[in-house]
Amino acid sequence: MSILNVEHLSHGFGDRAIFEDVSFRLLKGEHIGLVGANGEGKSTFMNIITGRLMPDEGKIEWAKKVRVGYLDQHTALEKGMTIGSVLSSAFDFLYDMENEMNDIYARLGDVDEDEMNKLMDEAGTIQDMLTMHDFYMIDAKVDEVARALGLLDLGLDKDVTDLSGGQRTKVLMGKLLLEKPDILLLDEPTNYLDVEHIEWLKRYLNDYENAFILISHDIPFLNSVVNLIYHMDNKKLDRYVGDYDKFMEVYEMKKAQLEAAYNKQQQEIKELKDFVARNKARVATRNMAMSRQKKLDKMDVIELAAEKPKPEFNFKTARTPGRYIFQTNGLVIGYDDPLSSALDLEMERGQKIVLTGANGIGKTTLLKSILGLIKPLSGSVILGDYLEIGYFEQEMDQSVTTTCIEEIWNEFPAFSQYEVRSALAKCGLTTKHIESQVRVLSGGEQAKVRLCKLINRETNILLLDEPTNHLDVDAKDELKRALKEYKGSILMVCHEPDFYDGLATDVWDCSKWTTRL
């Protein structure tokens, strides 16, 4: 059964086309991974099929009474709402049904026997619906999902405005999973999850009987939950049966076959053109030349897609710092309340340390405390000598209106325009991206702009807060290579073991010293 039908979809921003004549059908129960390079339009695609964005052309038709659930990290959570109330709101439609049933029972004393029988039938139907949807197990379901996502530890009575960005996303995800919509749309759900919660989400999605479309650059996660791949590339959407690894196998084979056919055809075109040029003027061979020309004119010329620019990250290293990068003495981090016990930490030159642990336990706060951006509640941080620090924040300020060129020029005013454009191009950004405002770019493209600032400055210590979030597979692989080759020290928050395996010299589990668990 088809639950979504898309026909001849075309859309773009200004003179930049995102899709051209895309058509597909989504069937009940399909588990789809939506993949493609940064900037190909995956999130735009989600916004279009959910009606948040009107396409330039095309028809989008959902089956009747299909419930669509979309993990939108920008949904407003207002003060006064608790974790528990947001999660329970997933069942508002059931509470409405219960109220309707209670209203029916309240009317029974005021009606005749025939009307009473009708009302009792209605109430019975509603009761069956409530039972079918496990209405009387709502509290147990809320507890199960809250525990699985690490929200139970925070307390279901906690106000949502006191949560970190990652924790708020978990609350929204929990609500969405409890709603069990007919089609679940998830845009990079693992960005704010630690390993334990990702494992739970894998199990949940594998058991999910309804359909879902998942955007993710986490390949092991994709491989474990999807049975179809939709590949967005060069304004088209292609469907592949199987997981991501199977898709790559078929895609590379098709690409090699197309290149072989292209090369063969180009050789044939060259020979035909050469024959026509040599023989069209001679009376004896003019007819043969005209025949070859007709063949050329009728030929369906194979075109190869333009190669996507692949990023090249090469970090510049500053002078050698002192032995210690930093030392902490009785450091207690936090805002109004402490997030940690008293910490006595030290990092030596050459170490590449990864901070792990659940969201909201203080990993980002530790980075900011070391940098002096947040004052500790008690204790001190002593920075080493001759440090040249590079800092990568988890998210950028979305109110900034500068273009990519202006962002880099503001950071490096001595650069010529050629140097600015070259620096951005090396990070995998095209001319159209470079001239756009940073805030209109995809999350992955924004991350590449911020990485561009880092790699063009000499550093000897990098503090990186979830640098892999939003990056596509090629960019992630290149970043890992560059960080492995980096001669300086690294302190990095990361939730992807596949990324930091073989890169980290040490892994610090922050759950051992947090006060939040």
Describe every region a protein language model picked out.
Residues 1-260, 309, 318-517:
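ABC ATP-binding cassette signature C-motif
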Residues 250-300, 305:
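Intracellular alpha-helical coupling/juxtamembrane segments of multi-pass membrane proteins
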Residues 313-315:
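Post-kinase regulatory C-tail/linker adjacent to protein kinase catalytic domains
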